[in-house]
Regions:
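N-terminal binding-site loop/beta-alpha segment at the start of enzyme catalytic domains
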Residues: 1-70, 77
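Short, acidic/polar
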Residues: 7-20, 91-105, 161-168
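Active-site groove signature of glycoside hydrolases
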Residues: 103-126
Length: 274
C-alpha cells in the first residue's frame, strides 16, 4: 500500500483492502514510515466508513515524519513516497506526537495496537544505545504505558526485525504483543527461543514478512535486499520438497509460522487483490 519497490496506486490499494475484507480478514497493519505516510492515509480512507468495532488496526511509532520537499522519487525502497522525511525519535514527547499524528492520518481516535518501530542494532547499528536510552530514560516506554492505561490504545508492543531487542524490552515494560518480521519463517527460525519465552509470558507474536521480503513467493528479495546465492539455493531445496507433496511454496510459507502457539496472527504485506 505504501509502494515498496514499485508504485502502488490508490485503486490497487482499495481493491486489495476490499478483497481482504471479502475473505474475512479484519486485522490491518500500517506505519507512518510506509510510503512516508502514504500507507496510513490510504488505509484510513479505506476503513474510516466501516464500523470501528468491526476490525483491528495497528500502527507504529519511533519516527516523526517531517515535511521536506527534497524527498526523492525513490528512497529506502519506497517508490514515489510523500514529501515527509522520517526522523528517528523514541522519546516520551515524540511517541505521543507520533500517535496523535497517526490518529489524524487514519481518522481514528482509538487504536487497537501501537508498536515501537524498528528499535534495535539491526536498524540502528552503533546508534542503538542512543535510541534505547530514548525509550527507557527518555520516557518512550512510559508514553506507551500511559496510552494503554488511558484507553487510547488497547495493546502495546514492538514491531522489529530482530529477536534480541524484544527480550530486552520485555524486561523494561509489560508489552502485550510483538510484530516480528522475517525471523520465524519457513526459511529462518532463529527467533524460536524468543517465541518459547513469549508463550511463557503470555505475549502474543504477530509474524510479518512470512515470505522473507519475497524470496518465498518467487522474487529475488531477501531481508529487503537482493538474495545471496546461498539463500537462493536453500529456497530451491524447500521448493523441491513442496513440489514433492504438491504444495505451493507460498502456501507452506504462510502456514508454517501459524503452527506455533505463540503466534496470534500473520501479516503478508499484500500490494494488490491478486
Amino acid at each position: 500500500m505504501g509502494g515498496l519497490y514499485s508504485p502502488t496506486t490508490y485503486g490497487e490499494a482499495q481493491a486489495a483492502t476490499e478483497a481482504a475484507w471479502a475473505h474475512g480478514i479484519r486485522y490491518f497493519d500500517t506505519a507512518p514510515y510506509y510510503g512516508y505516510t502514504r500507507s496510513e492515509r490510504r488505509l484510513g480512507a479505506l476503513l474510516c466508513d466501516r464500523e470501528r468495532d468491526s476490525y483491528i488496526i495497528s500502527t507504529k511509532a519511533g519516527r516523526l515524519m517531517v515535511p521536506d520537499e527534497s524527498v526523492s522519487a525513490e528512497e529506502n525502497g519506497w517508490v514515489q513516497p510523500l514529501p515527509f522525511r522520517p526522523t528517528f525519535d523514541y522519546t516520551y514527547d515524540a511517541i505521543l506526537k507520533s500517535f496523535e499524528d497517526s490518529q489524524q492520518r487514519l481518522g481514528i481516535v482509538k487504536l487497537d495496537i501501537l508498536y515501537i518501530h524498528d528499535i534495535g542494532p539491526y536498524t540502528h547499528g552503533d546508534r542503538h544505545e542512543h535510541y534505547w536510552r530514548q525509550l527507557t530514560a527518555g520516557g518512550g516506554f512510559r508514553a506507551l504505558l500511559e496510552l494503554r492505561r488511558s484507553g487510547r490504545v488497547t495493546a502495546i508492543g514492538l514491531g522489529v526485525n530482530e529477536a534480541g531487542v524484544v527480550q530486552d524490552a520485555m524486561q523494561e515494560a509489560d508489552i502485550d504483543v510483538v510484530m516480528l518480521a522475517g525471523r520465524y519463517t519457513l526459511l529462518e527460525q532463529m527467533s524460536l527461543p524468543l517465541l518459547e519465552k513469549c508463550v511463557r509470558a503470555g505475549t502474543g507474536i504477530v509474524i510479518a514478512g512470512p515470505f522473507n521480503s519475497g524470496i518465498l513467493v518467487g522474487n529475488n528479495k531477501f531481508d529487503y535486499e537482493d538474495a545471496p546465492s546461498d539463500v537462493v539455493q536453500r529456497v530451491q531445496a524447500l521448493k523441491a520438497v513442496c513440489d514433492e507433496f504438491d504444495v505451493p511454496l507460498p502456501a507452506a510459507a504462510l502456514h508454517f509460522p501459524m503452527a506455533h502457539p505463540a503466534v496470534v496472527s500473520c501479516v503478508t504485506g499484500a500490494r494488490n487483490a491478486q
